[in-house]
Regions:
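Catalytic loop of the DD-peptidase/beta-lactamase superfamily, centered on the K-T-G motif
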Residues: 1-91, 98-101, 108-154
Length: 154
């Protein structure tokens, strides 16, 4: 029984973000090395700058008025500590993937089943389109549990 339990525990993992590229191509490249200012959104992400650092992405964001720096690894969870003084949301793990048009980020709160997914892409008018999809939320439901917001380049 113990052997079966260990095998089961070793097989458990959160789903990785969609996308097959680790480096930006075509339209997705427009998201990098530029400050993006977002419209109002459920996660209170005010701005973000994505920077490639090897096979990981550095994310410098202003979230609810606070400057945060975190990292995402390609289809692998990278642990971050965004709220060191709040044990209830202390550690987040972030993974990313891309396709030719979009950047996909998955964020999981360690030691919980909470996960949220972000998709970002640039439309033909040079506007950033973003979606946020949590697996659970306190917010009123949206169709398909997906919230949409936009951003502009500074």
């Amino acid at each position: 029984a113990e052997k079966a339990l260990r095998a089961k525990l070793n097989s458990l993992s959160l789903v990785q973000p969609e996308g097959t590229f680790r480096t930006a191509r075509k339209e997705a490249a427009k998201l990098f090395d530029r400050k993006i200012l977002f419209t109002e959104n459920p996660r209170k992400v005010e701005s973000v700058v994505f920077t490639k650092e090897g096979y990981r992405i550095k994310i410098e964001a202003v979230i609810n008025g606070e400057q945060k720096t975190l990292y995402a690894s390609y289809k692998a969870w990278k642990r971050n500590n965004l709220y060191p003084d709040d044990f209830t949301k202390k550690y987040q793990s972030v993974a990313y993937a891309m396709d030719a048009e979009a950047l996909y980020l998955s964020v999981g709160l360690i030691n919980t089943s909470y996960k949220e997914e972000y998709s970002l892409w640039v439309n033909s008018e040079d506007k950033v389109i973003a979606t946020w999809r949590p697996n659970v939320t306190y917010l009123p439901e949206e169709p398909d549990m997906v919230w949409k917001f936009t951003g502009t380049f500074e």
